[in-house]
Amino acid sequence: MGASTTARLGPARVRSERRSCAAERHRLVDLYRYERRLARLGLEPVAGVDEAGRGACAGPLVVAAVILGSDRRNRIAGLADSKQLTPAARESIYNEIISRALAWSVVVIPSSEVDELGVHAANITGMRRAVAGLAVRPAYVLTDGFSIAGLNAPGLAVCKGDEAVACIAAASVVAKVTRDRLMVELHEKFPMYEFATHKGYVTAGHRAALARHGPCPEHRRSFVTVRRAGGRMELRITELADSDDSPGFASGPAEAVPGPAGSAGAASAAARPAAAGPAGRLVDQNRAADLRDNGDVSRPAELLEIP
């Protein structure tokens, strides 16, 4: 900033903006530290994988994999976990990622497949597909919270990786923006549920819509909120059929809409959480049985531990 800028904004404002710019530079340097460390170990390019819609009771599960360039001049300003960004910022950063990434891949798993596989299995399946769909084969894969078995590349899970690793943050943005756009399209098809507002997650308004209209084909029957709404709707129809005012309905016992075999609702379908740890520290693969290396990792996890 030159003298004219200082005169226009004032010294205090200029100092504040300089501090803000410096803080953002340091944040980005820190966000890319995993890619730098892996590059020093000869492991590049690095893919980051994350999903959107895991906890929603309607709509698809979307998984993205992204490989960013390692050149510091190619860093994406403002990149962060999608949950920390405004919708407008996500859209802007999404466009930057798509235009500047070495490779990216998106997998959309419909609600019917989520019900069939279960949320956790669908998530892992989507991660495998997303990595396999990359045009550039990664030398290493970093995931947010869950490791992926069966890849051709070694990989590790990072606690809160979408907050701590650039390529995972990029994947979180791509997955989130893609899914939000799909939910807006579903809103046009099923406007009574207001999917464009809550994006398929459980809210008071979404519960009220389910109570009024029952589930639509985009709702996940494996989630207890949806099953209960479906059961109430079946009961209401049966009560109408049994009443004298509705002779046109066939009578019969009330039946709740079942979920898929073996499902126990959203609580049990939710995936096991990653081992506890501060954001940006790799999960200890020896202490977390289901968060372990793929078996073909030639370097121990400790090599990537960063204080």
UniProtKB/Swiss-Prot annotation:
It is found in: Cytoplasm. GO terms for molecular function: manganese ion binding; RNA binding; RNA-DNA hybrid ribonuclease activity. The keyword Endoplasmic reticulum does not apply. Residues 44-235 form the RNase H type-2 domain. One of its GO terms (biological process) is mismatch repair. Its EC number is 3.1.26.4. It is an enzyme of class 3 (hydrolase). One of its GO terms (cellular component) is cytoplasm. Residues 250-280 have a biased composition (Low complexity). A divalent metal cation binds at residues 50-51, 144. Residues 241-307 are annotated as: Disordered. Pfam families: RNase_HII. Its main location: cytoplasm. Coiled coil: none annotated. It catalyses: Endonucleolytic cleavage to 5'-phosphomonoester. Residues 287-296 have a biased composition (Basic and acidic residues). Belongs to the RNase HII family. PANTHER family: RIBONUCLEASE H2 SUBUNIT A, RIBONUCLEASE HII. Endonuclease that specifically degrades the RNA of RNA-DNA hybrids. NCBIfam families: PRK00015.1-3, PRK00015.2-2. This is Ribonuclease HII.
